[in-house]
Design a protein with these regions (language model features):
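Extended catalytic core of nucleotide-activated donor transferases of GT-like folds
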Residues: 9, 54-145, 151-154
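Charged active-site motifs of nucleotide-sugar-dependent glycosyltransferases
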Residues: 4-7, 120, 205-212, 242-243
Length: 243
């Protein structure tokens, strides 16, 4: 059997509960039969900063992949150039995969010429706001491959990486931009029976034809006020007797 490729993952610590962390864990656990993983696990004021944690045995038990290899280096924030050089020298990854807003990675793009001499840079990205963010184009060109989480992102990245307006701009090939939507582990996320005492507590003993559930952080950028306003307008349309 040929030796598995090792991927260096730069993202939120996969043991955390953020969206980035949750999908990082799903991505890693779903590909352990294909790749070995080393993660720089980001968090704010990480309590385990600087301690390399070997999760391989636990991952082997959870996934059934006998040769699963997963290590995490917890860190404050997403790292820096000096840290990356040290890891590349010690771990010798075959590729770097980073994940989250591109503006967190300007230090990475500043050294892309140095990195890409030895391994490619991969980016799992989402950007859903139009018009196309031309200011992101150089970030995208710093990557050898981009996986777009949404169709909107795929369109944006495809258009920007195909531009040739400037002499220094080199368009990406078709294979360098792919649509890779989020998936879920159906063994963990599945319909289930809700205990009647829990349902009664949540709904105050009332019965409804259907119930909306919104799970998110209560912060401004998640726009909870928009959700409340949309729900109010919905209730106004169906009438008080049904709301």
């Amino acid at each position: 059997m040929s030796k598995k490729k090792k991927i260096l993952l730069l993202s939120d610590d996969m043991r955390m509960s953020s969206g980035i962390a949750t999908m990082s864990k799903a991505l890693v656990m779903g590909t352990l039969n294909e790749y070995d993983w080393f993660q720089v696990g980001a968090a704010i004021k990480h309590p385990d900063k600087g301690k390399v944690l070997d999760l391989s045995v636990d991952m082997q038990k959870r996934t059934g992949v006998e040769d699963a290899s997963v290590k995490i280096l917890p860190w404050n924030g997403y790292g820096n150039a000096d840290l990356l050089r040290q890891i590349m020298n010690s771990e010798k990854p075959d590729a770097i995969l980073h994940f989250t807003d591109p503006h967190y990675w300007t230090w990475l793009y500043d050294m892309e010429h140095e990195i890409r001499e030895s391994c490619p840079i991969l980016y799992y990205t989402i950007w859903d706001d139009l018009p196309d963010p031309l200011y992101n184009r150089n970030y995208y060109e710093s990557c050898d491959w981009l996986g777009a989480i949404s169709r909107q992102t795929y369109g944006i990245v495809s258009r920007l990486t195909s531009l040739t307006d400037k002499p220094t701009w080199k368009p990406h090939s078709d294979w360098q931009v792919a649509y890779v939507p989020h998936g879920i582990n159906e063994n963990e996320f599945k319909p289930t029976e809700v205990p009647s005492d829990f349902r009664n507590k949540i709904l105050a003993g009332k019965e409804y034809d259907f119930v909306f559930f919104w799970s998110n952080r209560n912060i401004r950028r998640k726009q909870p006020s928009d959700v409340i306003m949309a729900f109010k307008e919905f209730c106004d349309k169906i009438g008080k007797d049904k709301a």
